[in-house]
UniProtKB/Swiss-Prot annotation:
Pfam family, one: DOG1
Polar residues: bias regions: 1-13
bZIP domain location: 48-92
Disordered as annotated region, ranges: 1-49
Basic and acidic residues composition bias: residue spans: 38-49
Example of a GO MF term: DNA binding
Subunit structure: Interacts with NPR1/NH1 and NPR3/NH3.
Protein name: Transcription factor TGA2.1
Native organism: Oryza sativa subsp. japonica
Gene that encodes the chain: TGA2.1
Domain DOG1: 115-331
Length: 334
């Protein structure tokens, strides 16, 4: 009986030890599992934070992109509205009889606001030129005959003659408006010379668009470019001399007292300055005449197909300058 009791007690002790060992192992496993779970949770949280930040950055970038696109579209819409307003003003000007008619007497002075009238006429001129250039491009791509191309080219050259006449009339009304190029886009004004393009620079731009050229054509174009450059230099020097003379006249009696004699001297100086300003119109007319003659001489040197390519290249160049101005003004500003 005692032995049985002893075995029973020993069995109970062993069983209890086994249970305690199992509990300890279970607790240790639970702790390890808990620690592993905590590390996994922290890792998941870090990954979630990175993902959230990345998504937030992507959303912000997309939002800014939408804003830039919206601003660009709004700028284009605004430009369309301005163009529509200009067309309406042009119609009003025509109804009131203050525009320069292409079939009428170009020597009549502009009435009303000369600068506005010229701007409206120039807008109309550009629209008509775009139509003519599109017709020429279609004919060139369709390999039209030389006679058909000549009709279109002659029409475009006559259209250039028209804008020079309109500028001459506008210069009588407001020579500063024409010289400053306020009727041009900002990018065009960067390359402006005496109210228009430099003929010699235009010939340089066309060099790669006219090949192949004969030796006689090359010689003719080189001579034309040199003579244009010499005429430009002479006009530029004349303008510099005029500016210096005008500055000297205006600075003649700076800081003088307001006596009657000084007032008379002041009025005399202003009269002299006004007379010198009158020569600005002459400089502008000479510069436009140089531009006009260069275009016509270029046409005479080239074949009709080369002249067609030249007119297309000239138009595309100035169109890109205008487009560059529009893109620059519509660029996103952050």
């Amino acid at each position: 009986m005692a032995d049985a009791s002893s075995r029973t007690d020993t069995s109970i002790v062993v069983d209890n030890d086994d249970k305690n060992h199992q509990l300890e192992n279970g607790h240790s496993g639970a702790v390890m599992a808990s620690n592993s779970s905590d590390r996994s949770d922290r890792s998941d949280k870090l990954m979630d934070q990175k993902t959230i930040r990345r998504l937030a950055q992507n959303r912000e970038a997309a939002r800014k992109s939408r804003l830039r696109k919206k601003a660009y579209v709004q700028q284009l819409e605004s430009s369309k509205l301005k163009l529509a307003q200009l067309e309406q003003e042009l119609q009003k000007a025509r109804q009131q009889g203050i525009f320069i008619s292409s079939s009428g007497d170009q020597t009549h002075a502009m009435s009303g606001n000369g600068a506005l009238t010229f701007d409206l006429e120039y807008t109309r001129w550009l629209e008509e030129q775009n139509k003519q250039i599109n017709e020429l491009r279609t004919a060139v791509n369709a390999h039209a005959s030389d006679s058909d191309l000549r009709l279109i080219v002659d029409g475009i050259m006559a259209h250039y003659d028209e804008v020079f006449k309109v500028k001459g009339v506008a210069a009588k009304a407001d020579v500063f408006h024409i010289l400053s190029g306020m009727w041009k886009t900002p990018a065009e004004r960067c390359f402006l010379w005496l109210g228009g393009f430099r003929p010699s620079e235009l010939l340089k731009l066309l060099a790669n668009h006219l090949e192949p050229l004969t030796e006689q054509q090359l010689l003719g174009l080189n001579n034309l470019q040199e003579s244009s450059q010499q005429a430009e230099d002479a006009l530029s020097q004349g303008m510099e001399a005029l500016q210096q003379s005008l500055a000297d006249t205006l600075a003649g009696s700076l800081g003088s007292s307001g006596s009657s004699g000084n007032v008379a001297n002041y009025m005399g100086q202003m009269a002299m300055a006004m007379g010198k300003l009158g020569t600005l119109e002459n400089f502008l007319c000479q510069a436009d005449n140089l531009r006009q003659q260069t275009l016509h001489q270029m046409q005479r040197i080239l074949t009709i197909r080369q002249a067609s390519r030249a007119l297309l290249a000239i138009h595309d160049y100035f169109s890109r300058l205008r487009a560059l101005s529009s893109l620059w003004l519509a660029r996103p500003r952050e």
